[in-house]
Amino acid sequence: MAIEKELLDQLLAGRDPSEVFGKDGLLDDLKKALSERILNAELDDHLDVERLEGGPANRRNGSSKKTVLTGTSKMTLTIPRDRAGTFDPKLIARYQRRFPDFDDKIISMYARGMTVREIQGHLEELYGIDVSPDLISAVTDTVLEAVGEWQNRPLELCYPLVFFDAIRVKIRDEGFVRNKAVYVALAVLADGSKEILGLWIEQTEGAKFWLRVMNELKNRGCQDILIAVVDGLKGFPEAITAVFPQTIVQTCIVHLIRHSLEFVSYKDRRTVVPALRAIYRARDAEAGLKALEAFEEGYWGQKYPAIAQSWRRNWEHVVPFFAFPEGVRRIIYTTNAIEALNSKLRRAVRSRGHFPGDEAAMKLLYLVLNNAAEQWKRAPREWVEAKTQFAVIFGERFFN
């Protein structure tokens, strides 16, 4: 409902912007007046309901003062009371000291990568609110329950494509700051939309860790993954085939190219990349192997022998790529979504230095993912062609 212009003119008459929007200005006065009006209306309604229900006689019994935090200020409210003590306001509950928008503001700032100290300074500078670091941590800790629910939510029966990738995060563990891997699984559904299946902080290395992750996915309802795209994760192929025996494990071509370029001087990179293209764009596995051999024996292969060695080590999981038609290859090769996702996660953790523990890291990374969730839902342009080819290649498995 729009506020009448004449009423606004009366409220703003003779006031400059600082008197309206500043601390203890008109906006704060209005918020206080409206809140107290709502509280009194709530008590009237409460007393009317008790009378209609034939309860014991009850009536107003004065008021009490209560200081609460809102999203923009600290405010002292006059809270009406009833004689029987049965009134518990909905606007601001009896033992509540913060309006919900205050918590939402803190969580929003935290999700944007701001540290506890930065949030504290921001609230003090903009709103004149002095909030302790413990309170900010307590507010953000309320997210942990949502993290648990999200990490254990039911999954789809089948995912045509799942990218498994990792970022490195510094986390304090047993008195030492360790550089831990945080793994993320980004799935493409049958309609081309995307879903983040979960986040896992590395506790053990290799197949044992990945077996636990795969069993977790299965216990949450996932019965099949058609193609899993990974970046040389130790123990991953053995673990996924133990739980999802029909899954094709495919090395991420983009990561393999990047790894190859780590051996190459900067001035040579623009020439080496086209030379590698002949390998992964070959028509089939046999032609791809011949292209690899030609590269290995050629000028760049002789100058940078570690490149061909890297491709040969991963060749078993490069080969599946050649069996797919162009539409499916393009989807596997196009890693824009996972790259954008990792970029957001890295940007959020960059200013942190290190996290005090695994829970603190999970809390922030979950909030970053949750804020970006809408972006992952859109199907990529390439999916229209790829979907038809997935259906032909995988048949009934694709439609589960």
From Swiss-Prot:
Secreted listed as a keyword: no
Keyword set, alphabetical order: DNA recombination, DNA-binding, Plasmid, Transposable element, Transposition
Pfam families: Transposase_mut (PF00872)
GO biological process, one term: DNA transposition
MF term (GO), any: DNA binding
InterPro entries, per database record: Transposase_mutator
Coiled coil: none
Record family assignment: Belongs to the transposase mutator family.
Function text: Required for the transposition of the insertion element.
Protein known as: Transposase for insertion sequence element ISRM3
